[in-house]
Amino acid sequence: MLPLDGVTVVEVSSFVAAPLCGMTLSQLGAQVIRVDPIGGASDVQRWPLAASGTSIYWTGLNKGKRSATIDLRSPEGHDLVQRLITEGDGIVVTNAALPWLDHALLSAKRSDVIHVQLLGRSDGSTGVDYTVNAATGFPLVTGPVQHAGPVNHVLPAWDVCCGLYAALAVVAAIRRRDHSGAGARISLALEDVALATAGNLGLLTEPQVNGTQRQRLGNAIYGQYGQDFTSRDAVRFMVVTLTGRHFRDLVEVTGTGAAVAALAQALKVDFTAEGDRYRYRDVLSGLFATWFTDHDADEITAALSNTTVLFERYRTFAQVAQDPKVTDNKLFSVLDQPGVGDYLAAGLPAAFDGEHPRSAPAPALGQDTADILNQYLGLTASDIARLTSANTIAC
């Protein structure tokens, strides 16, 4: 039994954050009904696509859900979605700002409704991961030190964080409702997620209390010693020493003990202190780099594996997909996804009692419409035929 078995959630969404929230809840055992307009929302054909034209992206974020397609512009379509929410478990997650889907209207129909509204910005204005990220400061400290302009990271970090915060909010609201009977109106802004993260990590506190701001470091790690190195056969490694022992092992394995000691004496610093290791990271990296360029990747891996040094080689996505960390990992299982094919798909990263909840295939768009309307609203075959002929639903 999974934690959310027996819970039904209606999701009216698109793109990353809200679908990720719904998929996370599904992996925890909830029955998640994704409602889309007829023909699909604006993310239904988002790249990458499989050879069949099916969106790998869309199926990846909607695994394990059920799909209903309804005319979201018609009053009858509005009524169907409202009923699915209020006559079901009274839980909806959406990133769509639709008047007919707002909390006040739904709570008038069901007082304990749990309504989670994802926003771009807290004032209701539009914001997406890429624009929110630009306003947070992160692109100006990302990338090579010599680079003058901003560098966007590829990971839609704020969408991912927002989706997981939203899933947490749903679980917390269910817990509260179970104890008090109260519903919840939850708003979660993408920009607030990014700002809170920057604040919690000290990036906004630093200029307020110290009058300083973070600078671009390339692949170095702020406040610690960490750097990337290249092997003789052109394989790049990320090497991190968080503790004194890590650093001592790196010095020993690279045979730089005498040089590091002489450097410490010349600079009158103590490399057992992480602050000094960080301040003089460039000259230390110069000492260590020779050892890396004198050895092949396999030699480096073998040598560092016998130490406490934290390291990993950089890999492409294609290399990762073939690595035992994927192919021999219980997190992944073979998924037969219609339109895409068989592939190793991740389940829920959290293992419950040693087992990762597995993913089920994403639905075809609208494949469950008739079954959902019959199961939750009691609509008959003739009702569904009438709604289909009126283009209120698509099955």
Predicted feature residues:
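A short glycine-threonine-serine/GTX helix/turn-capping micro-motif
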Residues: V151-C161, R185, R216-L217, Q224-G226, ...
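Aromatic-enriched alpha-helical interface/lid elements that frame and gate functional surfaces
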Residues: Y225-T307, F311
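Mid-domain beta-loop-alpha active-site segment that forms a flexible
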Residues: P156-V171, L190-N200, L242-H246
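Short, well-structured beta-strand/strand-turn elements
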Residues: V32, S305-Q319, L379-A385
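N-terminal helix-loop segment corresponding to the beta1-alpha1 unit
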Residues: M1-H179, D298, A364, A370-C395
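Oxidoreductase and adenylate-handling cofactor-binding alpha/beta cores
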Residues: G163-G183, N200-P207, V251-L263
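Conserved Rossmann-fold dehydrogenase catalytic segment
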Residues: H147-L155, D178-A194, R216-N219, V269-D270
